């Protein structure tokens, strides 16, 4: 089983992870540990279940609650993709280099 399902971390972010989309225009995501990067076309989020890429058009962060691990995104959503551990490391490396 994936290590994300087995880990019980001591962080303040709840271990539960939910994604709620309303009409492809509004996303509420819980279980977010860290916002790796974001712009108007893509958000890269580290969640308790792994790296999550949200791609779309005119994306905006409407709410960020660090203590509860909740992110709200507004805009036209094209896709949501969970990256496996190897892809997540590659994506993090790419974005880390890009935004240094």
From Swiss-Prot:
One GO CC annotation, please?
membrane
Entries under InterPro entries matching the protein: Spore_YabP, Spore_YabP/YqfC, YabP_sf
Q: Which ranges are annotated Polar residues under compositional bias?
A: 1-14
Query: Which segments carry the region annotation Disordered?
Result: 1-22
Annotated localization: Forespore outer membrane
Query: What are the UniProt keywords, alphabetically?
Result: Membrane, Sporulation
Upregulation details from the record are:
Expression is sigma E-dependent and negatively regulated by spo0A.
Q: Which domain of life is it from?
A: Bacteria
Segment forming the signal sequence:
none
Q: Principal localization?
A: membrane
Q: Which GO terms describe its biological process?
A: sporulation resulting in formation of a cellular spore
Q: What does this protein do?
A: Required for sporulation.
What name does UniProt use for this protein?
Spore protein YabP
Q: Which organism is it from?
A: Bacillus subtilis (strain 168)
